[in-house]
From Swiss-Prot:
There is a cross-link at residues 11-18 (Cyclopeptide (Ile-Pro)). There is a cross-link at residues 12-16 (2'-cysteinyl-6'-hydroxytryptophan sulfoxide (Trp-Cys)). It comes from Amanita bisporigera. Pfam families: Amanitin. Processed by the macrocyclase-peptidase enzyme POPB to yield a toxic cyclic decapeptide. POPB first removes 10 residues from the N-terminus. Conformational trapping of the remaining peptide forces the enzyme to release this intermediate rather than proceed to macrocyclization. The enzyme rebinds the remaining peptide in a different conformation and catalyzes macrocyclization of the N-terminal 8 residues. Keywords: Hydroxylation, Thioether bond, Toxin. Signal peptide: none annotated. This is Alpha-amanitin proprotein. The modification 4-hydroxyproline is found at residue 18. Major toxin belonging to the bicyclic octapeptides amatoxins that acts by binding non-competitively to RNA polymerase II and greatly slowing the elongation of transcripts from target promoters.
Length: 35
């Protein structure tokens, strides 16, 4: 589930709102650090 969401969110964020895309990038970076 996490991998699927991580794949879709950046596309949605960048396509709809750069600010959201930045937030998603930060979340993905933190997620990778946790892994």
């Amino acid at each position: 589930m996490s991998d699927i969401n991580a794949t879709r969110l950046p596309i949605w964020g960048i396509g709809c709102n750069p600010c959201v895309g930045d937030d998603v990038t930060t979340l993905l970076t933190r997620g990778e650090a946790l892994c």
